[in-house]
């Protein structure tokens, strides 16, 4: 980890990170994080009864548990704004909301109606404006006009699906769904699977998302703010997430190790100089501290922050290159999966930029109207 941050610091005058995802590999020593969190979230409907430590409340916006039988969101109401009457309701036509109408539940309903949650994304994805039923086309080909075409409503206790078809092309369907959600206090519950993955998610107020899988491996999607400047800010954000995450684990799992690790992590946040932060991170790796010793890069992107004032020559890019140009002038390096990958493509990017500058200078010095076609091809296509 320290070597990665050292290199990102070396190039931060030219490149800034955008997407940054990483994994914390499961360790036997820390126990069943997934199972214990699942048990706590499944049995409670108040945020305070899950997260006892009030010091970390401002950092955590929501907890989500999703498996085949149940999806449950527990929200921290204090992290949401007070809505006025003109606040846009996003999802009423997708959901039937059942609530006990208490003050706490009514506030949760208000938040759910206005937040673009994963439930909204899921139900929007499963609503299909047009879908071709190829099985029914086959019936038409082989069975003539007497083939049976389905349209109508299919439903269970929590999901209603309406299938409509055009009388002239009955194999083309329009599918719409409505989902029932039960809101009690801070909990938003629906039955059945509402995600591709079976995970527990911790959503932070800074938009970082931690996904915990059944084997307690974690996938962390580190958010980025517009005011993030350089590697030191990135380290502070990552270790701020670590600090609050590990205190949450200590809260739920009752494993004092996480409290010890949180204190070590806090030292990284407390020191101000980058060299001091990197020194502490290196020491954590040497002592096999959770969060550093089991850190594994998932994927990250870099963007070239300087302006490209010269002509861009796309022909210099390999077909499978991770160097991409967006909108003609924006250079990004995408889907980097290791430090070696990063060093390799930054080097290629630097060399390519120099080559483009040289070609651009030549191109600007010649008379395009009189120059030979072969010479122009050599500049533009090779």
From Swiss-Prot:
It holds the Pfam family Pox_int_trans. The keyword Transcription regulation applies. The keyword Repeat does not apply. InterPro entries: Poxvirus_intermed-TF (IPR008789). Keywords: Activator, Transcription, Transcription regulation. It comes from the Viruses. Acts with RNA polymerase to initiate transcription from intermediate gene promoters. Belongs to the poxviruses A23 family. Heterodimer of a 45 kDa and a 32 kDa subunit. This is Intermediate transcription factor 3 large subunit. The lineage of its organism: Viruses, Varidnaviria, Bamfordvirae, Nucleocytoviricota, Pokkesviricetes. The gene is VITF3L.
């Amino acid at each position: 980890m320290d070597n990665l941050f050292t290199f990102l610091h070396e190039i931060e005058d030219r490149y800034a990170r955008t997407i940054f995802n990483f994994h914390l590999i499961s360790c036997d020593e820390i126990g069943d994080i997934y199972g214990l969190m699942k048990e706590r979230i499944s049995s409670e409907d108040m945020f305070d009864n899950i997260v006892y430590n009030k010091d970390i409340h401002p950092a955590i916006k929501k907890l989500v548990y999703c498996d085949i039988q149940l999806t449950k969101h527990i929200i921290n109401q204090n992290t949401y704004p007070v809505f006025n009457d003109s606040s846009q309701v996003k999802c009423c036509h997708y959901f039937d909301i059942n609530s006990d109408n208490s003050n706490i539940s009514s506030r949760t309903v208000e938040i759910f109606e206005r937040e673009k949650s994963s439930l909204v994304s899921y139900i929007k994805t499963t609503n299909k404006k047009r879908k071709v039923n190829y099985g029914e086309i086959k019936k038409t080909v082989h069975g003539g006009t007497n083939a049976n075409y389905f349209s109508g409503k299919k439903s269970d206790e929590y999901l209603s699906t309406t299938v409509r078809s055009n009388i002239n092309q009955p194999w083309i369907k329009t599918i719409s769904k409505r989902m029932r959600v039960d809101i009690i206090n801070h909990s938003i519950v629906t039955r059945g699977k509402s995600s591709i993955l079976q995970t527990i998610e911790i959503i932070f107020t800074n938009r970082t998302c931690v996904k915990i899988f059944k084997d307690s491996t974690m996938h962390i999607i580190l958010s980025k703010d517009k005011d993030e400047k350089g590697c030191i800010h990135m380290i502070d954000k990552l270790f701020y997430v670590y600090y609050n995450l590990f205190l949450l684990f200590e809260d739920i799992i009752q494993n004092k190790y996480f409290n010890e690790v949180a204190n070590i992590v806090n030292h990284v946040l407390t020191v101000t100089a980058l060299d001091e932060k990197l020194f502490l991170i290196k020491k954590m790796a040497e002592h096999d501290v959770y969060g550093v010793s089991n850190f594994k890069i998932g994927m990250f992107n870099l963007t070239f922050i300087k302006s490209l004032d010269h002509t861009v020559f796309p022909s210099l890019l390999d077909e499978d290159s991770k160097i991409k140009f967006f909108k003609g002038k924006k250079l990004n390096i995408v889907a980097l999966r290791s430090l070696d990958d990063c060093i390799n493509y930054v080097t290629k990017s630097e060399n390519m930029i120099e080559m483009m500058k040289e070609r651009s200078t030549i191109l600007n010095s010649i008379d395009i109207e009189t120059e030979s076609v072969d010479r122009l091809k050599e500049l533009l296509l090779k």
